[in-house]
Amino acid sequence: VLIGLGLSGGSFMVVLAAFTRLVPEDRRSWSLGLATAAGSMGQFLFAPLGQGFISAYGPVTALVLMGGMVALVPILALALTGKGDVSDEPEIPVREAIRGALTHPSYLLLTAGFFVCGFHIAFITTHLPPYLTDLGFSGGLAASAIALIGLFNVIGAYTAGVLGGHQSRKYLLSGIYFSRAVAFSLFIILPTTPFLVILFSIMIGLLWLSTVPLTSGLVALMFGTRNVGMLFGFVFLSHQIGAF
């Protein structure tokens, strides 16, 4: 429970909402992609680091060391500027903002899409490694598949943010979901080989969290930045329910 509460307090909905309010519109999509890629890089680096701590010092000491690193975050946060300037946007009551979002067809479709995104991510993370071992592949290949997803996720998230600043975000998002469907279909239809596993991991990695900067950017585009944290929070809630 405590880990879940902590993760929610430092999750994408909080970080990306801050970026959305602080960064000008012409650089917003790029900044959202950068923030998402940075979070993905942290996941990619800290997973083996944590395992190294466990192997070297044991689980209790490893937990203390990792917790100490997390404890530095609030100290570093003191240097941040705080809330962004949204004085040029009208003040909208929370209830009215929620009502407007829940009656906005595009927002509802965006939320539904993110629900499916959460299901994709949780399904692959949970079932891909045991599926590969059940087929007789080594645990090393299964671990490499997850590592490749994490590595190429950094590239995909940043690229999506950059493209979102120059192309239509809704079409980019549609293309990502369609590409996922193609990747899943090919992985199911074709004979499973180590080469296919690696290729699938790279493709899924590029598409993994590339939806995040585009989705948060679309929420800001629809409703402005004043309530973007709350409204993207509802979308992200749908994502987590899909993952559950």
Regions found by a protein language model. Give the residues of each.
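A late C-terminal transmembrane helix in Major Facilitator Superfamily
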Residues: 43, 209, 222-244
